[in-house]
Amino acid sequence: MSYQGRARKFLESASIDVGDMVLVEKPDVTYEGMVLDRADDADDRHIVLKLENGYNIGVEISDARIELLEKGSEPRIELPPVEAAEDPELPDVSIISTGGTVASIIDYRTGAVHPAFTADDLLRANPELLDIANIRGRAVFNILSENMKPEYWVETARAVYGEIKDGADGVVVAHGTDTMHYTSAALSFMLRTPVPVVFTGAQRSSDRPSSDASLNIQCSVRAATSEIAEVTVCMHATMDDLSCHLHRGVKVRKMHTSRRDTFRSMNALPLAEVTPDGIKILEENYRKRGSDELELSDRVEERVAFIKSYPGISPDIIKWHLDEGYRGIVIEGTGLGHCPDTLIPVIGEAHDMGVPVAMTSQCLNGRVNMNVYSTGRRLLQAGVIPCDDMLPEVAYVKMCWVLGQTDDPEMAREMMRENIAGEINERTSIAYFRG
């Protein structure tokens, strides 16, 4: 039981546990229902009941009396196995979970939440997958995506590598949406893959009528059977439940806090439009299935700073990172790739110390061009690495990966300027900007 403080004492005073049926009386209303657990960080002034009509309510306890009606057991989900024989005519797709909204199912009777990443769980929630591929599923870990770290990128890459090595024809990675584009970029650099690797998630949980989880999973499995052998992100194309877009893993970004079509290709077109029934190629320039040998380069350097330029930013911010031993810096600059000229001397110091400093743009659309204005030219003279049309988050991830491959500052500069996974376009088309 996760209840703490006053709420816990309130329940314990009547020998009540999670799962028990209770009567709660307040001065003007009486409730009967099952006691549900709460999050660890919830306040201690309320308890949660599941009423007979299926709704969950919070009850403030300061003026309440509680009575045990019937002992129960803590809500849990017990599901029968799924009878599904492998179809030798279908491809084999592995689905691995790192956590997030898409990675759970909910028991509407009890309110219990269950991590949903055995093959049985996936097929029970999405029986349509049986028409697309043979499915195997497992959880690598279960964390909120805001708690992702570079070490988890490595663990995810190794898990995907293992699935492909074991014969998977495609891999789907279920991930929380907040930092999915960081992890998709990381695996784009770490893996050379002969098969599709598709990231997906959900903006809205499966207990909501507007959930996007089912379509995203189905379309992702379909994409994992395609000929696009790259690391990609597959999420809703529009607010409607019609199709998903397949985005290159280094050219995608979460662009809205809550919309189901939050993920957008930036400085690029989506690679494909996907439905559970098929895939329509939108961009012909992609790595084809079987064109690369499987390869894993998973060393990363975590001591990389990601710094946003803003009016009044102090040079001490960069100096602090240098004093703390950071090995690389990525600046999210303004406009064409600028920052206040007060930063230029300390950026020059970083360059002289062998710490590469890369420049991206907060504009997201378009590309860095540091030859237009004097500030940009002075930054180039100080040793800044221009990142063309690379997204800021991708440049940060790439710097972590590059510095895991080399200690040589000049080699790091060359690698940052090299188009390794489709993160840099030779030119930026007006077709890429939606406005």
Swiss-Prot record:
Keywords: ATP-binding, Ligase, Nucleotide-binding, Protein biosynthesis. It holds the Pfam family GatD_N. It catalyses: L-glutamyl-tRNA(Gln) + L-glutamine + ATP + H2O = L-glutaminyl-tRNA(Gln) + L-glutamate + ADP + phosphate + H(+). Its EC number is 6.3.5.-. InterPro entries: AsnA_fam, Asp/glu_Ase-like_sf, Asparaginase/glutaminase-like, Asparaginase/glutaminase_AS1, Asparaginase/glutaminase_AS2, Asparaginase_C, GatD, GatD_N. GO terms for molecular function: asparaginase activity; ATP binding; glutaminyl-tRNA synthase (glutamine-hydrolyzing) activity. The active site is at 101, 177, 178, 254. Allows the formation of correctly charged Gln-tRNA(Gln) through the transamidation of misacylated Glu-tRNA(Gln) in organisms which lack glutaminyl-tRNA synthetase. The reaction takes place in the presence of glutamine and ATP through an activated gamma-phospho-Glu-tRNA(Gln). The GatDE system is specific for glutamate and does not act on aspartate. Belongs to the asparaginase 1 family. GatD subfamily. This is Glutamyl-tRNA(Gln) amidotransferase subunit D. It comes from Methanothermobacter thermautotrophicus (strain ATCC 29096 / DSM 1053 / JCM 10044 / NBRC 100330 / Delta H).
